[in-house]
Amino acid sequence: MSVDQELIETQKNWIPLEANPEVLTTFMQSLGVSKDWEFCDIYGIDEGLLEMVPSPCVAVILLFPITNEYEDKRYKLEKEIEEKGQVLSDKVYFMKQYIGNACGTIGVIHSVLNNANVIEFNENGFFKQFLDKTTSLSTEERAISLLKNSEIEKSHEISALQGQSNVPQEDEPVVLHFVSFVHVDGHLYELDGRKPFAINHGESSAETLLKDTANVLQKMIDEDPKEIRFNLMGLVKKPNEESEEEEEKEKEETK
């Protein structure tokens, strides 16, 4: 058995991150993302609530429960894609998850690195170095690279302990899971490290990312209407105070 395979089978577990925008923002910025970017709450998928999300919003992170119904649909969809294929841009940055409870961190990585063309990085920070090191690697090799990275493991632990909720133990069962939605090359992709590949949810654009993600979530809700445990966060550029003042002024003038 190779050292890498032994690492995978050892199944390292981390403390789960809290679905808290402040926690994820601090975590992301500590790893080299410009302070111009932050996570914010998305309070619902109705059009009015989506309009409250600052623009640009370049990624959406969804926290949801893993149920038996979801797992059945997941395996069915994966089999269908394996048989029929799907459009998958080579520009999509996707990695597998080999660390227990690391889905929050992987959701942040997927959100950030699929927007490396618009997000500013610290040249010496984790994200820039990890992207440079892993761009040419396979999804499995990227996961192994993360598994071996002590810097992000330490940052994850610090952030996990900063949340407002009670901190679970590393080996405590967790049924909630983070996935990321991003727009790449004209399509909406769902990025979930538990799945073998990114899922293409159809045509999209930078402008319609929020609406298109909301449509996917609505389908999930329709399939299991009893399940209401969802949490949404957006990766957005911090609103410019001057721009906000101008917008308020325009609103007043149009009244």
Swiss-Prot record:
InterPro entries associated with the record: Papain-like_cys_pep_sf (IPR038765), Peptidase_C12_UCH (IPR001578), Peptidase_C12_UCH_sf (IPR036959)
CDD domains reported in the protein's UniProt record: Peptidase_C12_UCH_L1_L3 (cd09616)
Organism: Dictyostelium discoideum (Social amoeba)
Database matches in PANTHER family: UBIQUITIN CARBOXYL-TERMINAL HYDROLASE
This enzyme's EC code(s): 3.4.19.12
Keyword Hydrolase: yes
Entry keyword set: Cytoplasm, Hydrolase, Protease, Thiol protease, Ubl conjugation pathway
Molecular function terms, GO-annotated: cysteine-type deubiquitinase activity
Annotated protein name in UniProt: Probable ubiquitin carboxyl-terminal hydrolase
